[in-house]
From Swiss-Prot:
<dbReference type="GO" id="GO:0006183">
    <property type="term" value="P:GTP biosynthetic process"/>
</dbReference>
<keyword id="KW-0067">ATP-binding</keyword>
<dbReference type="GO" id="GO:0005524">
    <property type="term" value="F:ATP binding"/>
</dbReference>
<comment type="similarity">
    <text>Belongs to the NDK family.</text>
</comment>
<keyword id="KW-0418">Kinase</keyword>
<dbReference type="InterPro" id="IPR034907">
    <property type="entry name" value="NDK-like_dom"/>
</dbReference>
<dbReference type="GO" id="GO:0005737">
    <property type="term" value="C:cytoplasm"/>
</dbReference>
<keyword id="KW-0547">Nucleotide-binding</keyword>
<keyword id="KW-0479">Metal-binding</keyword>
<dbReference type="GO" id="GO:0004550">
    <property type="term" value="F:nucleoside diphosphate kinase activity"/>
</dbReference>
<feature type="binding site">
    <location>
        <position position="114"/>
    </location>
    <ligand>
        <name>ATP</name>
    </ligand>
</feature>
<dbReference type="GO" id="GO:0006241">
    <property type="term" value="P:CTP biosynthetic process"/>
</dbReference>
<keyword id="KW-0808">Transferase</keyword>
<dbReference type="InterPro" id="IPR036850">
    <property type="entry name" value="NDK-like_dom_sf"/>
</dbReference>
<feature type="binding site">
    <location>
        <position position="59"/>
    </location>
    <ligand>
        <name>ATP</name>
    </ligand>
</feature>
<protein>
    <recommendedName>
        <fullName>Nucleoside diphosphate kinase</fullName>
        <ecNumber>2.7.4.6</ecNumber>
    </recommendedName>
</protein>
<keyword id="KW-0963">Cytoplasm</keyword>
């Protein structure tokens, strides 16, 4: 299996719950390494640019409002099969559908306030990582 990089965002709801350490610990326990990290308070424009792919969807405005409502922790995770591994750790988008023991089952409140974001493909990961990080900010292990 190839070593990959994926973007993960710990969203405002999980930051407010002081769940950053618990979530990062799950990534590390699963064999993912943190190659980059920064805490940010996104502007609505920042959130809108990041989620531009969803611009035509009915939830876009609320998503941008939520993602700019408080600080987030943006990380680049690295490891074998990192994209799929991160998505498995996160669980289903709607925490009501998330398997027990996943991040969303344990920390999310709703489909909107669902604790974490993770890239869904290698192409998306490359774009998402470049949205937040320059090459000099990412460190291979």
């Amino acid at each position: 299996m190839a070593v990959e990089r994926t973007l993960s965002i710990i969203k405002p709801d999980a930051v407010q719950k002081n769940a950053i350490g618990a979530i990062l610990g799950r990534f590390e326990k699963a064999g993912l390494r943190i190659a980059a990290a920064k805490m940010l308070h996104l502007s609505r424009d920042d959130a809108g640019g990041f989620y531009a792919v969803h611009q035509a969807r009915p939830f876009y405005g609320e998503l941008c409002d939520f993602m700019s409502s408080g600080p987030v922790l943006v990380t680049v995770l690295e490891g074998e099969g990192a994209i799929a591994k991160n998505r498995d750790l996160m669980g289903a988008t709607n925490p009501k559908d998330a398997a027990a023991g996943t991040i969303r089952a344990d920390f999310a409140d709703s489909i909107d306030a669902n604790a974490v974001h993770g890239s869904d493909s290698a192409e998306t990961a490359a774009w998402e990582i470049s949205y937040f990080f320059g090459q000099r900010e990412i460190f291979a292990h």
